[in-house]
């Protein structure tokens, strides 16, 4: 059964409450890694066919590998024979399994997130995968852009960024935090409440940790998009209220191909989930084998 037909069959089965099992289920192995900072990170790994590229999927802001749409996309790709790695960023927590609340104390930084992405990409490459595709969702897409802007592993042949949108923050809060840090009037133990993404005035973090995310604004993100060291494609939802209407054109102006899926929201719910997986699979089929 082809990927498109299997996806459509699942959708029809879901409408009638039927559980449609994959023909060749790929069992996930949970792997652990002790990072240089001593934190234990985890990921689910499923081995696929050597002729297909390996895929690393990264979840959105404060979420885990079990969060949609990356969790369902990972299942679909594994069923289609792709090697799939889905890490959960630790955000400074050993073996993190739950989404992190806005009200939690956030000492993690963008730099730490990038280091973890690098670790897992290298982990895949060290297992012999010479063709790796990175797929991110929402802020996970932004984190991947910053990873690509550094020294990405040469095994990364393609990047697919879904629901790539600017990370919402308040300019006055940013300027105040910058002033506090510049005047050395803060410490790692001095926490404050900020607005960041969907955390509206209740994102608790030290100034420096907060600034690591917000000083990388959408203008810098767009600038880096045009300088990535691996080919990038962007997939957006036509009904995504988290982006302004001119956002797709701003991305295209950087020379990046953009696909807008009609009626899809930020999480590609309902039938648009299958439109997303169809588009992703069509891209993956053009790439070299994961292992030779």
How should these model regions be labeled?
Residues 2-13:
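Bacterial N-terminal signal peptides that target proteins for export
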Residues 27-48:
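N-terminal cap/lid segment of alpha/beta-hydrolase-fold proteins
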Residues 91-108:
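Cap/lid segment of the alpha/beta-hydrolase catalytic domain
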Residues 104-127:
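Alpha/beta-hydrolase active-site loop
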Residues 105-108, 154-283, 287:
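The alpha/beta-hydrolase serine catalytic core
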Residues 134-136, 162:
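Short beta-strand immediately N-terminal to the catalytic nucleophile in serine-hydrolase-like folds
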Residues 136-140, 144:
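Gly/Ala-rich beta-loop-alpha elbow adjacent to hydrolase catalytic centers
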